[in-house]
Amino acid sequence: MCYNAKNEVIALKKIIVSACLLGENCKYNGGNNLDAQVVEFVKGRDVIPVCPEVLAGLGIPRITIELKDGIVTRKDGVVVDEAIRKAVTQILAQVKEEDIECAILKARSPTCGVHQIYDGTFSGTLTDGAGVLAQALLDAGYIVWDNEDLEETQ
C-alpha cells in the first residue's frame, strides 16, 4: 500500500514502476529484476513502466553507472549525467500529465534507489541517498517506495 503525508492509505489507480521489476529486460546486463510481490501489488492498476537509463539512451546491455557527488558516471569514467537528468525530466512530465500519485522503484539503483545507492566507487559499497529519479520525485512531493519497502509491508 502507499500512504500520503498524513499516513493514510491511498487508493492507487495509476502508478509508475521500474520496468525491470515488472520483468522487462532493461538492466545494465540485459536481464531484469522481476519482483513477484511488485507484480502482484500492481495487478488491476494502470501501470506505467519506466527505465531512466534506457530512456537516456544508454542501451541494453550497458556499462554500469553510479552516482558520485551528484554526478552520474559510467564505470569507464564517461559522465552521462546530462542524459540521465534529461530522461528524468521527461519522466516527471509524464508523471504530472498522467496524474500519478505513487512510484515503486528499484532499490539501490543509481536512478531509482530510494534509501540507498552505490557510492560511486564501483566497489559495491552502499551509501545513504536516493537515485536521480527517486530524488526528483520526492522533491516534487510524490510518494516513492522501493521494491524492498513494498516487501516489508506485505
Model-found features: residue ranges?
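Short, positively charged and aromatic/hydrophobic N-terminal segments
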Residues: 3-8
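Extreme N-terminal starter segment of soluble prokaryotic enzymes
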Residues: 11-15
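Short, well-ordered beta-to-alpha junction loops that form the rim of enzyme active sites
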Residues: 20, 106-109, 149
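Short N-terminal binding/cap micro-motifs at the start of the first secondary-structure element
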Residues: 23-30
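Divalent-metal-activated hydrolytic enzyme cores
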Residues: 9-10, 25, 55, 65-67, ...
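Short, surface-exposed acidic-centric catalytic microdomains
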Residues: 33-74
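N-terminal glycine-rich phosphate/adenylate-binding segment common to multiple enzyme folds
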Residues: 90-121
